[in-house]
Amino acid sequence: MTSGIASVVSTMSNGSTAEVGIWGKEGLAESFQLLGGARIPNRCFIQVAGTALEMPFRDLQKEFRKSDELRDCVLQCVQSQGFILGQLAACNRLHEAEPRLARWLLMVCDRVESKSFYLTQEFLATMLGARRTTVTSAASALQRNGLIKYSRGRIQIVDSEGLQRVACECYRTVRNLHSAFYGQPVEA
């Protein structure tokens, strides 16, 4: 992607879902598939519309084999996404909904480089692996505390420093990983 946000979501046999990966312009869809092996059954969603470059997968595989530069870039992306996947799995298991929502909103804000974007509560519930009522409650608490404004799918981050204080440690961990891999901090 050159702008926007994509998420990778894992779906269980009972239909429940959880986000297991997120990226903006630093990511590459299907990067794990370039390494070979079985197809990964996760689904990719565009969270925030943007632009992306597109190439048939077979052509990308060919270039991956030929180009050291592309291979290094893809391997860096895979390594980064692997670390983030692990952090998000721990986050979804160990942290309450409100700090997870704060973390997630900050990660989106960093990647779209905007403090305002559109997302439905149903979509947020899918990304957080939570019930819609849980997301409604968490978003209401963040809004009551003056950290966000939320109306009809439009989310505006009003106080990013306050939101960072509410966010679980996973936001800082993922942010530091991003800086280590890509040499540039992301800003909320």
Annotate each predicted stretch with a short phrase.
Residues I5, G50-A52, R154:
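Structural motif
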